[in-house]
C-alpha cells in the first residue's frame, strides 16, 4: 500500500526527469505498481482511510511521484456534474487539445509539494488522451473541465514538469487569455 512516506517531495530528481514508456504488455510488477497508485488515490479520498493512514487527499498520482520513472498515471476525479473519471493508465498521451484554455480559480496543488504555491495554472480547456488500461484496453477519451486539468497535471509529471512552472512569475494571478475559469 502506498502512503505519503512513499511520495517524493519537490526537489527530488525523479520529479524533473522524463519518464520512460512502459513496454506493453506490462510486467506483473508494473501492473501492481499502477494498481497500487489508483488504490492510493481512491484511499486518499476516503475520510476514514485518509485519517487512519495520514493520507493527503488527492485526485491523481504519477509514477515519478513514487520514484518510478515510468509513464504511468492514476486519476480519480469528478467533473462539475458529478461524473467520475477513474483511470489507471500506461503510456498516457495527449493527442489533441483545444486552443481555448482553462484554469482553476483556487490554483493547483500537488502531493509532492507540501506548501501552497499561489497562482493560476493555464491548461487546455479540452484534451483527447490515449493510453492503455490495467486490463490492457487501449482507450481514447475526450476530457474537459476539472478532469482535463487533472490529466494535464499528471501527464506533466511524466515530462518532468511541475504545476508551478506554468504560473506567471511576474503576475501569478494574471487571468490567462481566452480561458474558462473553473471553480473547485
From Swiss-Prot:
Pfam families: Pep_deformylase
InterPro entries membership: Peptide_deformylase, Peptide_deformylase_sf
GO BP terms, alphabetized: co-translational protein modification; translation
S-S pairs: none
Molecular function, one GO term: peptide deformylase activity
Enzyme Commission number(s) from the entry: 3.5.1.88
Biological role: Removes the formyl group from the N-terminal Met of newly synthesized proteins. Requires at least a dipeptide for an efficient rate of reaction. N-terminal L-methionine is a prerequisite for activity but the enzyme has broad specificity at other positions.
UniProt-recorded name of the protein: Peptide deformylase 2
Species per Swiss-Prot/TrEMBL record: Bacillus subtilis (strain 168)
Amino acid at each position: 500500500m502506498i502512503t505519503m512516506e512513499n511520495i517524493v517531495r519537490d526537489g527530488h530528481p525523479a520529479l524533473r526527469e522524463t519518464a520512460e514508456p512502459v513496454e506493453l504488455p506490462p510486467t506483473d510488477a508494473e501492473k501492481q505498481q499502477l494498481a497500487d497508485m489508483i488504490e492510493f488515490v481512491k484511499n486518499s479520498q476516503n475520510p476514514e482511510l485518509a485519517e487512519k493512514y495520514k493520507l493527503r487527499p488527492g485526485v491523481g498520482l504519477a509514477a515519478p511521484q513514487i520514484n518510478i520513472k515510468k509513464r504511468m498515471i492514476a486519476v480519480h476525479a469528478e467533473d462539475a456534474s458529478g461524473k467520475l473519471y477513474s483511470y489507471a493508465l500506461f503510456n498516457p498521451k495527449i493527442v489533441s487539445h483545444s486552443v481555448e484554455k482553462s484554469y482553476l480559480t483556487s490554483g493547483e496543488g500537488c502531493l509532492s509539494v507540501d506548501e501552497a504555491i499561489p497562482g493560476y495554472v493555464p491548461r487546455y480547456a479540452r484534451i483527447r488522451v490515449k493510453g492503455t488500461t490495467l486490463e490492457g484496453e487501449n482507450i481514447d477519451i475526450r476530457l474537459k473541465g476539472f478532469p482535463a486539468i487533472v490529466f494535464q497535471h499528471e501527464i506533466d509529471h511524466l515530462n518532468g514538469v511541475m504545476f508551478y512552472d506554468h504560473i506567471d512569475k511576474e503576475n501569478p494571478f494574471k487571468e490567462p487569455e481566452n480561458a474558462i475559469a473553473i471553480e473547485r
